[in-house]
């Protein structure tokens, strides 16, 4: 009894799985899949990825469809097995089997063949209703059920009848794993096996042969199912809830079967109580059978119900176990709370009584109707609270005896083992039997079969070939036309052969004509006739046209609509004057007025035939304009004649006449095309000639010679010359002429290859293409590589091939041995050098990044088993997304293809990047190949519109640095003007021009004229940069050798720097006719033809000559008897060092520039050029600007001049608004005066002196300088700025005579008898001279000249530490001599200026050089009157205090040779101002600078302090220094603001002698040698 109750429990294990499978099956029941069966069908269902499902035949095989199928796909036949359960229709089929079931491995769509077909019609027997259920087991990839319409032999249109009886069956399927199947799958499979075996017999064996589950009596092995608890209408198992369908089962073979009607089955027996005491739970279940034909149908009601059991207490003390206690607690609830639950469990609840009483229920019915049984009664514990415990058991049992004897039912013994399979191979049968023990005492006999039979299939029968056999033809399809002639077709499938059997013979499709009826033909209008002429020429008019009706026929309708119609013509208004292109004379042709939108045509020029076309269009503003004319229909007379001759030879060849003169025609065309084409029509004419020549070569009456082949290829190369680029672009507008070119070359390879008598190779290398033809047998073929090793190329571009093609030998195999032995293949490979630039494939974002390669094999192979390998070298840098493309005219562009590719296609090729500069293409077809690349974001423009960023950076940095150098030189030109500066500026201009031309040349490769000009000028400027370096070396050599530099020499410099490069370029252009200048890829000298030596040769010669000059200059510098002038020696050394640094860097720069320009793909050369070019600019600026002392001083002088001009030191205004007139000469003297006291202004002096030395001097000046240098030291001096010499005439007390008079104009300064102020200067030199100054006071003359600084604001302290060295005067070409003299008379005031004396000589002459820069503006000067005119003699203002009267000394009374010191100044720098300074008194100018008094006092105090340190006491005539009146002079405020200079010691302040009364001193001896400090030599500039 316990075993019977537990049996239905495991059924509920399937609930979660069934829910999931049914939901997935409903959502995705039908899905199309590959290899599922024959192609598209009206209704085909493919189930895959499902492990359980159900369908009905009515849903899968609709009545209105003739060919339907249902296919179940096995995920993996090695791991899973398919099982199917079919519930058949209750009535037999009315006809032959219409639904077939079979399994197969795969299906070939091309031949409509099933492979590995095995039929299950014998297993299922759908038309036999004697066995309501049928099962099968399938182990192949697909399990299919297909319904086929019976063939219709007498009807043209198949009729879909009502659904047959076989459409009423239903199917359940299950996919079970062969290893470790799931428990739920085994539960269902075991029940299917139980049902299958139960219904099996000899005529209907069971289709389930074996299972991976261990089934015991129809149940899967394993532990029993867990408890189930009902709750409402939900089926629960282990607390997992689900809908009613979760509890659905398909066990239709259980007892009380309701398989035909559907609904609930009978309740099972109560199961075992869950507890032995204390109250337990018993359950029972029932099964729902869905109604036939209703998929997924369920039953209403509860699947499981339960009741309490074993309510008696457990244990003697009234305590129960935990389970019983739980039941007690549950039973202790109120009766009204348990009412519904007890009713649900199905047993009556006890009567409600006293809450404290325990009432027993009545004794139950005896558990057995015969034999010994049990009776039970129960009671409830009614308590007021849950804490109260009831005493005594809750359940009681007692025995009940019945006198009746229980019947013994018949029982089956165990099944015998399965018998062996009836067949050793193929499908057979096996069975087993069992014995029934007879019943007793009226028991029931044994139920169920005594014998079970099932199919067995051990293995396929070997050794017996099974030929493929066709399935039945499908029904004819509907006629393609409802009337008149139509077509019908039907198909069939082949069951594939096995064991080496033959394939199905015949066609899988048949077609036949069908004719249902004559179609009525309606009347049909014929095409409209052309429109008549318009009634008006413009404006509103009308046109008429008519048509004819054809028909009707066979009852058709008549033509509808009018027979004629009218339309307006000239609806467009008459064109306005601005919408008509005016008459134009363009290209020596008169174009008449033409309205916009029309094309005008005129005859071609006299040397051509045809028409020139020119279209008139409207611009965006609606103004008519002429488009450029097109010469696509113009053919030159020469090309036209050759075209006519070629057509005549072709006509002869077609008639079988031998060809004579064909070679001459080709040779003539080579000569004509060598000079280029005049019109785009010449290109088309040449292509037509070559096409006709190919047809002539194809004829057997003419055999082409090697010369013909070479001329043919040469003509193709001439067509692709760079000069014909514009002609190609114009020809492309008329049609795809590139396609014609590819076809022409392919036909030529075919003809020439097969007309070769021997198996040999042919190579033709020209300037623009390389053609290779191989003829080889298929039997001995090897891999072909292009280009082959050891080939001879004439052009530089083809000597080192960068592109390679590999054709595998598998291409030449036909698959048949006999055919391979007799087959001969011709392989043609063409490498086009520049065809890619002619094709209209470049866009704003894409570029053709390689050469074009065409590969042809004749006869063409069916397919390429080994891909064709092509390696391309990239032509441009900065590109991405390299894509292999091929020429395919049959390919229809799709949405996924790149736009605007035209006949180019990316299909059929696979791109394999090799490195940054190479790409490999693997293609599965033969065609024309190239690489299409995408420009980067910064290069998103047309090809070669901008140079690379590297070139821009290199040229830009170099040009900017050199331009800055030029600007600096121009700004300080007056100070550094010299031959070396002129050479440097020309050198910089040549480099800047070269950089600009390099960048321009990168953008003009397509413009032939501009590119040629850029190449020529680049050649010129490259050479000029080398020549200017040579010019600098030459100038340095002439300087160290002492040659005179005059205008003739300077002209020679210009001729060398600019003339020699111009001569070389002119000769090169004249000899080559500019053909070598510029190529297709760069604007520079062509690497072919030797033109590059026109640059390399002169550049190398310049380098060698420069080295020789450098060696000579170096020897001159290091020799003992070399250069004695230190300044000249320093300049020569600097020039030599500049050449040694700049020249190698210049050579490296231009060498890398040539490599970068000619090989634009190499980023290394561009980077090297950018580095060298930038470094060259920095080095030139460093050598000639930053490290050049002259430039530094000139820049400082320029800055100081600007500051002084801003401060108003030019004397332009005063406090009271009085203007001060300062002449240029006064400014020169003022600049020199300020140089003495101001260290910072020393740069002005240095730059001025350097400029004076470097300035070209007249021969007389050179002689004077040499004579001056040979004289005594006392006669040597220089004037400020550009004053070249100072001549000092001795006084009576000075033992020196007057110097010889020089031819230059001298400015003579005479002293007055009155005592004058002394010379004051700054620097350590005065400290060393203090002792001499003191000792010479008594015997010196009473005269001196005071040189005052312009401003005190610019005075700065002397540097703390300054290197000192003593240099003898006669060793320095620029030495200065200071002549100081004081008067012995102490009574005369030292501040009294000298009386004005007329100059002893004529006016000074201005020098040829530029004057020095204007002095920087000083602080506001004191108010003073304007200087008197030169012809008047008023006394200048006194230098003393405002209260002191000015001294006015009278004229000189003694002889000038005894009483005066005459200082003669040779003013060569003022020669150009002779007329302006004729009446100027130099002494008056020197003493009118009252604003220098402050500085004068400070310097005088310094001299006094130095004299005191040498213990030289001043004379008693010294006067104490008077106090200055505050705020009476403007410089006093500055003095207070800035304080006392740092170099003035404070102990100098109490000195008694006034600095303004310093006595004059004179040199004790004439030949005194003055030790000069280094910086003082530079600062000391003016001597009096």
From Swiss-Prot:
GO terms for molecular function: G protein-coupled receptor activity; lipopolysaccharide binding; PDZ domain binding; phosphatidylserine binding. Coiled coil: none annotated. It is found in: Cell membrane; Cell projection, Phagocytic cup; Cell junction, Focal adhesion; Cell projection, Dendritic spine. Glycans are attached at residues 64, 401, 607, 692, 844, 877, 881. Its main location: membrane. Residues 760-939 form the GAIN-B domain. It comes from Homo sapiens (Human). InterPro entries: AGRB_N, GAIN_B, GAIN_dom_N, GAIN_dom_sf, GPCR_2-like_7TM, GPCR_2_brain_angio_inhib, GPCR_2_extracell_dom_sf, GPCR_2_extracellular_dom. The modification Phosphoserine is found at residue 1469. Residues 970-980, 1030-1052, 1115-1136, 1188-1584 are cytoplasmic. Residues 1-30 form the signal peptide. Proteolytically cleaved to produce vasculostatin-40 and vasculostatin-120. Vasculostatin-40 is the major form and is produced through proteolytic cleavage by MMP14 between residues 321 and 329 with cleavage likely to be between Ser-326 and Leu-327. Ubiquitinated. Belongs to the G-protein coupled receptor 2 family. LN-TM7 subfamily. The chain crosses the membrane at residues 949-969, 981-1001, 1009-1029, 1053-1073, 1094-1114, 1137-1157, 1167-1187. Disulfide bonds join 273-309, 277-314, 288-299, 366-400, 370-406, 381-390, 421-456, 425-461, 436-446, 479-514, 483-519, 494-504, 534-569, 538-574, 549-559, 581-616, 604-634, 884-921, 909-923. One of its GO terms (biological process) is negative regulation of cell population proliferation. Phosphatidylserine receptor which enhances the engulfment of apoptotic cells. Also mediates the binding and engulfment of Gram-negative bacteria. Stimulates production of reactive oxygen species by macrophages in response to Gram-negative bacteria, resulting in enhanced microbicidal macrophage activity. In the gastric mucosa, required for recognition and engulfment of apoptotic gastric epithelial cells. Promotes myoblast fusion. Activates the Rho pathway in a G-protein-dependent manner. Changing residue 927 to D: Increased levels of vasculostatin-120 and decreased levels of vasculostatin-40. Interacts with ELMO1 and DOCK. When bound to ELMO1 and DOCK1, acts as a module to promote apoptotic cell engulfment. Interacts with MDM2; the interaction results in inhibition of MDM2-mediated ubiquitination and degradation of DLG4/PSD95. Interacts with PARD3 and TIAM1; the interaction is required for correct dendritic. localization of PARD3 and TIAM1 and for dendritic spine formation. Interacts with MAGI1. Interacts with MAGI3. Interacts with BAIAP2. Interacts with PHYHIP. Interacts with DLG4 (via PDZ domain). Vasculostatin-120: Interacts with CD36. Vasculostatin-120: Interacts with ARRB2. Residues 1365-1584 are annotated as: Involved in interaction with MAGI1. Residues 884-939 are annotated as: GPS. The TSP type-1 repeats in the extracellular domain mediate binding to phosphatidylserine. They are also required for bacterial recognition and binding to bacterial outer membrane lipopolysaccharide. Residues 261-315, 354-407, 409-462, 467-520, 522-575 form the TSP type-1 domain. Residues 31-948, 1002-1008, 1074-1093, 1158-1166 are extracellular. This is Adhesion G protein-coupled receptor B1. Residues 1391-1439 have a biased composition (Pro residues). Induction: By p53/TP53.
């Amino acid at each position: 009894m316990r075993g019977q109750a537990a049996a239905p429990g495991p059924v509920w294990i399937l609930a979660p799985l069934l829910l999931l499978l049914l939901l997935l099956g409903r959502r995705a029941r039908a899905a199309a899949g590959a290899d599922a069966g024959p192609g598209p069908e009206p209704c085909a269902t493919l189930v895959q990825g499902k492990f359980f499902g159900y369908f009905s035949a009515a849903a899968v095989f609709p009545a209105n469809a003739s060919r339907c199928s249902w296919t179940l796909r096995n995920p993996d036949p090695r791991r899973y097995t398919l099982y199917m359960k079919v519930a058949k229709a209750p009535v037999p089929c009315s006809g032959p089997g219409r639904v077939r079931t079979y399994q197969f491995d795969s299906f070939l769509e091309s031949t409509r063949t099933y492979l590995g077909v095995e039929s299950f019609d014998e297993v299922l027997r759908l038309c036999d209703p004697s066995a309501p259920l049928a099962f099968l087991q399938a182990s192949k990839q697909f399990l299919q059920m297909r319904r086929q319409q019976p063939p219709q032999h007498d009807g043209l249109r198949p009729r879909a009848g009502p659904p047959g009886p076989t459409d009423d069956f239903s199917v359940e399927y299950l996919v079970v794993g062969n290893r470790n199947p799931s428990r739920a799958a085994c539960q269902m499979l075991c029940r299917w096996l139980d049902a299958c075996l139960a219904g099996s017999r000899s005529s209907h064996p069971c289709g389930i042969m074996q299972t991976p589950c261990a089934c015991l009596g129809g149940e899967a092995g394993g532990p029993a199912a867990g408890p189930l608890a009902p709750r409402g209408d939900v089926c629960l198992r282990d607390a997992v809830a689900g809908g009613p369908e979760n509890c659905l089962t398909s066990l239709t073979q259980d007892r009380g079967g309701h398989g035909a009607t559907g609904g609930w089955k009978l309740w099972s027996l109560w199961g075992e109580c869950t507890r032995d005491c204390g109250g337990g739970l018993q359950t029972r279940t029932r099964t729902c059978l869905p109604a036939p034909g209703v998929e997924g149908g369920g039953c209403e009601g509860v699947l499981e119900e339960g009741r309490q059991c074993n309510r008696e207490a457990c244990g003697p003390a009234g305590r129960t176990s935990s389970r019983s206690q739980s039941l007690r607690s549950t039973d202790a609830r109120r009766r009204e709370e348990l009412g519904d639950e007890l009713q649900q469990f199905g047993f009556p609840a006890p009567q409600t009584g006293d809450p404290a009483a325990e009432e027993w229920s009545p004794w139950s019915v005896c558990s057995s109707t015969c034999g010994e049984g049990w009776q039970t009664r129960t009671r409830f514990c009614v308590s007021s609270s849950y804490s109260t415990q009831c005493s005594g058991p809750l359940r009681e049992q007692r025995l009940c005896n019945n006198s009746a004897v229980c019947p013994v039912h018949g029982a089956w013994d165990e099944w015998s083992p399965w018998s062996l399979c009836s067949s050793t191979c193929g499908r057979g049968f096996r069975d087993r039997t069992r014995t029934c023990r007879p019943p007793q005492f009226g028991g029931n006999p044994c139920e169920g079969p005594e014998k079970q039979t099932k199919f067995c299939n051990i293995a396929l029968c070997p050794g017996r070939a099974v030929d493929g056999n066709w399935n039945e033809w499908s029904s004819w399809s509907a006629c393609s036309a409802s009337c008149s002639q139509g077509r019908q077709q039907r198909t069939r499938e082949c069951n594939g052969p096995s064991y080496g059997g033959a394939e199905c013979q015949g066609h899988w499709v048949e077609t036949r004509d069908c004719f249902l009826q004559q179609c009525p033909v309606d009347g049909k209008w014929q095409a409209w006739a052309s429109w008549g002429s318009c009634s008006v020429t413009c404006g509103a008019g009308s046109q008429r046209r008519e048509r004819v009706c054809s028909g009707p026929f066979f009852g058709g309708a008549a033509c509808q609509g009018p027979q004629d119609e009218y339309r307006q013509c000239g609806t467009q208004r008459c064109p306005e004057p601005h919408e008509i292109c005016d008459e134009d004379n363009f290209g020596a042709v008169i174009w008449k007025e033409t309205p916009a939108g029309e094309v005008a045509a005129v005859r071609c020029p006299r040397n051509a035939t045809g028409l020139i076309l020119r279209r008139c269009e409207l611009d965006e503003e609606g103004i008519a304009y002429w488009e450029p004319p097109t010469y696509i229909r113009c053919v030159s007379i020469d090309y036209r004649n050759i075209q006519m001759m070629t057509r005549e030879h072709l006509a002869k060849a077609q008639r079988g006449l031998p060809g004579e003169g064909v070679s001459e025609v080709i040779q003539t065309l080579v000569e004509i095309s060598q000079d280029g084409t005049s019109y785009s029509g010449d290109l088309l004419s040449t292509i037509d000639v070559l096409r006709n020549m190919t047809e002539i070569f194809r004829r057997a009456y003419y055999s082409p010679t090697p010369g013909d082949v070479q001329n043919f290829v040469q003509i193709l190369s001439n067509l692709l010359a760079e000069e014909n680029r514009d002609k190609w672009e114009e020809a492309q507008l008329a049609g795809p002429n590139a396609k014609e070119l590819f076809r022409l070359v392919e036909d030529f390879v075919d003809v020439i290859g097969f007309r070769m008598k021997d198996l040999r190779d042919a190579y033709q290398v020209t300037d623009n293409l390389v053609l290779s033809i191989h003829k080889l047998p298929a039997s001995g073929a090897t891999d072909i590589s292009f280009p082959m090793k050891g080939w001879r190329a004439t052009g530089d571009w083809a000597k080192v091939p960068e592109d390679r093609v590999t054709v595998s030998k598998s291409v030449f195999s036909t698959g048949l041995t006999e055919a391979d032995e007799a087959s001969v293949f011709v392989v043609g490979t063409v490498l086009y050098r520049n065809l890619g630039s002619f094709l209209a494939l470049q866009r704003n974002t894409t570029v053709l990044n390689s050469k074009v390669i065409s590969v042809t094999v004749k006869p063409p192979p069916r397919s390429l088993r080994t891909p064709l390998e092509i390696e391309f070298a990239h032509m441009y840098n900065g590109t991405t997304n390299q894509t292999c493309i091929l020429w395919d005219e049959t390919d229809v562009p799709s949405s996924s293809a790149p736009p605007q590719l035209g006949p180019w296609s990316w299909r059929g090729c696979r791109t394999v990047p090799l490195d940054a500069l190479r790409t490999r293409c693997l293609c599965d077809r033969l065609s024309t190949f190239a690489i299409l690349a995408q420009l980067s974001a910064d290069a998103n423009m047309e090809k070669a519109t901008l140079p690379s960023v590297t070139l821009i950076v290199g040229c830009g940095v170099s040009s900017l640095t050199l331009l800055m150098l030029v600007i600096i030189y121009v700004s300080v030109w007056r100070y550094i003007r010299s031959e070396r500066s002129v050479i440097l500026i020309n050198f910089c201009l040549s480099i800047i021009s070269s950089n600009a031309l390099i960048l321009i040349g990168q953008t003009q490769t397509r413009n032939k004229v501009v590119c040629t000009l850029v190449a020529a000028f680049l050649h010129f400027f490259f050479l000029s940069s080398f020549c200017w370096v040579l010019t600098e070396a030459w100038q340095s050599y002439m300087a160290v050798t002492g040659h005179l530099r005059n205008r003739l020499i300077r002209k020679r410099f210009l001729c060398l720097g600019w003339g020699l490069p111009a001569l070389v370029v002119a000769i090169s252009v004249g000899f080559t006719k500019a053909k070598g200048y510029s190529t297709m890829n760069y604007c520079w000298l062509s690497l072919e033809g030797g033109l590059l030596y026109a640059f390399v040769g002169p550049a190398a010669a310049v380098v060698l000559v420069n080295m020789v000059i450098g060696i000579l200059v170096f020897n001159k510098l290091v020799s003992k008897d070399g250069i004695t002038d230190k300044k000249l020696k320093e300049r020569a050394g600097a020039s030599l060092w500049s050449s040694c640094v700049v020249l190698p860097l210049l050579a490296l720069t231009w060498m890398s520039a040539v490599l970068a320009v000619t090989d634009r793909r190499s980023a290394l050369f561009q980077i090297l050029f950018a580095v060298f070019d930038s470094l060259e600019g920095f080095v030139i600026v460093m050598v000639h600007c930053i490290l050049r002392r002259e430039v530094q001083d000139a820049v400082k002088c320029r800055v100081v001049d600007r500051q002084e001009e801003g401060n108003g030191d030019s004397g332009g205004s005063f406090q009271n608004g009085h203007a001060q007139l300062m002449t240029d000469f006064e400014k020169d003297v003022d600049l020199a005066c300020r140089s003495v006291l101001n260290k910072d202004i020393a740069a002005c002096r240095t730059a001025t002196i350097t400029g004076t030395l470097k300035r070209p001097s007249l021969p007389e000046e050179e002689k004077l300088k040499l004579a001056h240098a040979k004289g005594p030291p006392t006669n040597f001096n220089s004037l400020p700025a550009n004053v070249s010499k100072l001549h000092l005439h001795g006084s009576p007390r000075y033992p020196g005579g007057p110097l010889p008079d020089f031819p230059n104009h001298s400015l003579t300064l005479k002293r007055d008898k009155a005592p004058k102020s002394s010379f004051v200067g700054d620097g350590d030199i005065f400290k060393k001279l203090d002792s001499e100054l003191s000792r010479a006071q008594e015997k010196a003359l009473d005269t001196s000249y005071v040189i005052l600084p312009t401003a005190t604001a610019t005075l700065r302290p002397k540097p703390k530490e300054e290197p000192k060295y003593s240099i003898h005067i006669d060793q320095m070409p620029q030495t200065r001599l200071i002549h100081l003299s004081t008067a012995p008379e102490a009574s005369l005031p030292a501040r009294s200026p000298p009386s004005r004396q007329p100059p002893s000589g004529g006016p000074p002459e201005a020098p040829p050089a530029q004057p020095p820069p204007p002095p920087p503006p000083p602080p506001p000067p004191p108010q003073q009157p304007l200087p008197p005119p030169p012809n008047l003699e008023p006394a200048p203002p006194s230098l003393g205090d405002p209260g002191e009267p000015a001294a006015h000394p009278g004229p000189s009374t003694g002889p000038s040779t005894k009483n005066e010191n005459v200082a003669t100044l040779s003013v060569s720098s003022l020669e150009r101002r002779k007329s302006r300074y004729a009446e100027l008194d130099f002494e008056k100018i020197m003493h009118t600078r009252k604003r220098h008094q402050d500085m004068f006092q400070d310097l005088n105090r310094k001299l006094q302090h130095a004299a005191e340190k040498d213990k030289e006491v001043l004379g008693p005539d010294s006067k104490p220094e008077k106090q200055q009146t505050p705020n009476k002079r403007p410089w006093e405020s500055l003095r207070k603001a800035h304080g006392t200079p740092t170099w003035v010691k404070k102990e100098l302040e109490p000195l008694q002698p006034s600095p303004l009364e310093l006595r004059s001193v004179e040199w004790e001896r004439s030949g005194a040698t003055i030790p000069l400090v280094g910086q003082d030599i530079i600062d000391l500039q003016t001597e009096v």
